[in-house]
Amino acid sequence: MSKFIKSFQYGKHEVRFETGEIARQADGAVMVAMGDTQLLVTVVGAKNAKAGQDFFPLTVQYQEKAYAAGRIPGGFLKREGRPSEKETLTSRLIDRPIRPLFPKGFMNEVQVIATVVSLDPEIGTEVPAMLGTSAALSISGIPFDGPIGAAVVGYKDNDYILNPSSQELQESDLELSVAGTSDAVLMVESEASELSEEIMLGAVMFGHEQMQVAIDAIKELKAEVGKPAWNWEAAEEDIDLKTKVFDAIRSDIEAAYDIADKMDRYAAIDAAKTKVMEALAATEENPEGYDAGDIEKMVGKLQKEIVRGRIIAGEPRIDGRDTQTIRSIDCQVGILPKVHGSALFTRGETQAIVVTTLGTEKDAKMVDDLTGSYNDRFMLHYNFPPYSVGECGRVGSPGRREIGHGMLARRGVAALLPTADEFPYTIRVVSEITESNGSSSMATVCGTSMSLMHAGVPLAAPIAGIAMGLVKEESGFAVLSDILGDEDHLGDMDFKVAGTEQGVTALQMDIKITGITQEIMHIALKQAKEGRLHILKEMEKAIGSSNQDVATTAPRFFTVKVKPEKVREIIGKGGATIRSITEETGVTIEIDDDGNVKIAAVDDESANAAKARIAEITAEPEIGKVYDAKVVKIVDFGAFVSYMPGREGLVHVSQIADERVEDVNEYLKEGQEIKVRLTDVDKQGRVKLSIKAV
């Protein structure tokens, strides 16, 4: 067993690859360390593709182990369960830059598993996870046109920061993840505080430049310990079949792409497919015909050639637009009467109903990850039901795509949200995609902005999002604004930008080809800004600023300040007192150790009742004041009475009546309601109560 180690300096951290000792039965296995953050990344590929396989079955699984941070998992089973949101998003982050680097036609199953085994809370796991995946694939022998590098870029005080620590990210105006090869950027994911397009592009180029040291190290690792490359070659294209398919239905497909309506267009394309299948596919009557799957692939190639060729030639796009025109937009707010905030955003054949719900601090989502537990007071949930694309399908818990799209939309609006001190609500936004033909995540950003403003959330500025596309051939390129679903599928780049009039708040880029230059990205960002500003103007027609007040059905907050030593009295034994207040008044109460009592109520009457109860509990005894009291216990020398919530005092036998009292039971009974006057408080805080002084 021989272990090989490759180390290099990456910014302020040392990165170390170890291979040859652990997980030796995997095709590729690398233990990657960045400081004290360490992951085991393994790659396994099936030597043969399954018969009839018509897609590339790549799966990436990023998983965090509690022991990596010296913790034991919670829950009854005390072991890791279903993937967390962070694990799902990181799996997607690894998948996106490596997927386009597998050769066309490669259909063998490949599985990547990245396991966090040691964690330094100040060093994130995303960069070592992507570098470890790149290294494991590079040495595995599996066909892979890598390696890739990865970096996280921060921005503070006009300077870019390479792979910032967790503390630095909290103070940064930017968190941008970028991955790419030695000569091309492949993936960007970012969240920003209204930064300019120039700063965003500069961050991408800075990250790509800095990651070259990692790419070079992985190339050296491959040269020294890489396994022999698999003997795999893509099947040769069937020119005869291609000619027959193209000749048979080219005119039909061209006519289909003159149809603006998506469903009508798909029907025309399906008719053309049926026509060519009937003519060329193998059947019992025609066993010499072609495989139906091969014919389907050729139809796809014809579709791609026609759509891309028209765009490069400067002809109108599928729905008749030029490259910069945005589809027609319709915006409405207040479409649902009993919710706290709602909006309907429609852009062409993409539509979202977005609903905002306001809650209290107790409604915040408790997140428990390797770094610890915290409460998240802003949630954005994206749902993509099958009917939105006219299909039947699974309905249930969200998939990876829905989680990813929801997080992208969340990043787009998060920087504009008020602080907890400015707006003490927990906020949940749900985006229901009711129609989809491209850019539903950006429709969610637009709908979220309007829904939040309608709910009375004081956003710093309205936010809009737009999806850009790219078609690039040897003869030229075209950047497309507000892409359709087909343009996303048939194009070379998916480029989503969210932001305000002032700047960018989120940027996501996935590039399927090499050769995307800085000039092309600059044009795309500039064109995206123009489109974003147009969309913001359309949104402003429905709602231009946040409503001044929240909905009447939303909770309202009232704050009462009490002395810290009174907190225990409000809570009561085992929480009995505070529970009785909430049950009797219908409010929600949150209280901290500093004496800040936050009351959430749906109306003033409930709030006032709760405040009155709290005032009673925390009130200080006043000498000379008459109180309504109840006899709690009778003793030989008097009676103990409850005269204030949580407070008891003694009425001495001499203070029960004007005459001499021989037997207290002749004058008082336990449970009897009486009036008493507080006559004095001694130095120990003990009160003197009198019945006869009333």
From Swiss-Prot:
Residues 624-692 form the S1 motif domain. GO terms for biological process: mRNA catabolic process; RNA processing. Residues 555-614 form the KH domain. GO terms for molecular function: 3'-5'-RNA exonuclease activity; magnesium ion binding; polyribonucleotide nucleotidyltransferase activity; RNA binding. It is found in: Cytoplasm. Keywords: Cytoplasm, Magnesium, Metal-binding, Nucleotidyltransferase, RNA-binding, Transferase. Its cofactor is Mg(2+). Its EC number is 2.7.7.8. Involved in mRNA degradation. Catalyzes the phosphorolysis of single-stranded polyribonucleotides processively in the 3'- to 5'-direction. Belongs to the polyribonucleotide nucleotidyltransferase family. This is Polyribonucleotide nucleotidyltransferase.
